[in-house]
Amino acid sequence: MTTYMDPVLFKHAEEGHFRPFKNYQTRLDQLLTPDENTILHVYLGNQSREPESTYFVDKILEKCPPLLFQANKKGEIPLHLAARYGHSNVVKVLIDRAKARPTDPESGVTEAKKMLRMTNEEQDTALHEAARNRRSHVVEILTKEDRPELSYSANVHGETPLYIAASSWGQEREKVIDEILANCISVLDYGGPNGRTALHAASAVGDHETARKLLAKEKKLTKTTDDNGWSPLHYAAYFSTWLNISVVKVLLEYDASAAYIAETEKKRTALHIAAIQGHVNAMKEIVSRCPACCELVDNRGWNALHYVVASRRTEVFKECLRIPLLDRLKTKKDDKGNTPFHLIAALANENMLWARVLYEGEVYGLNKQKLSIKDIYNGDLAEIQEILESLEDVGRGPFGCRRIVLEETNEKNKKEKDARIKHESLSTPVKRINRI
């Protein structure tokens, strides 16, 4: 029968009372909880604030030195918990205790180095824990102790400490990133899950300052793509807003040619991604920095203006037509011979706002079925449905999102939209093409 830590002793461990353990007859490393936490794990996990004194930790390790390296069921040693909860003074004590031990004669690695690199069941080191929880003081201690050899290896999820820090928000985050960048003398690992890098992460959260710091260290990160072929610029284009395109600007400042990078499957560039998201300011910045990228089309022959139509946002489409480089795309045909206005003709059947765009555009041309824009508008349901289905097939976003474009689907938004269309149609006359 398994015997677990006595509840009274557990409480003393939580509170950091050494006296009950001072003359305890059983070895302290045999006092375990069901998760195999030792009294040090219990103590460190219970401290919501950094302990003012390291007395309890010092005295326990004096009495039972093996506890320094003893792991719980998750493979966590006391250093993992001290790093997670930001107990920098305890981290120093643990490292000093490890330094006092003799170096392994075979490997030549000191016990302190060995402890710093120990991983839990998810392959997280103490540095991973400190970075994830934004413990800048702990990160400073850990990175300085293990340089210049520190490898910054990835955990089972492919996350390096730098990637974890770049992915998060909150206080101390910038200091964590600065400490890692400053104290890494050897090769720095920027990697993250699914081929992403810390620059992808910074782009996703809209952090232009971190993006600039990373590029100052490693400029080629602008061309590093994830497993789907998305560059950091793809992420910045996707996550930018009408008001904030700061990361897009930084990435293009360092490497405007990143706008030429097309993803693996659908061959969409960052301009396509900005278009489907309706991020017109990001589109303006991309075409101003790399004008020729407008010529790139996806695997269906769609240019950026086709994607703006797929975004279903008339105001964005009108704004794009005011940009000369994008306005020229309105007559360009895809692999089926459809211009962006052929797509609009299908939408105009069910949406008065698109009907207004259609009749103001005055674009002509036949697709490969010999159908003009007027033919599609006046066509049968099958022709219209085929185009509407193509507008739905715009691919996936990052992190496995099923759709890129976010549409108004709930009943409340639908009613508001119908009311707006009705109001605008009453206030602004719209010409109608006579159906044949």
Residue ranges and their predicted role:
Residues 1-436:
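Regulatory and partner-binding modules of innate immune sensors/adaptors
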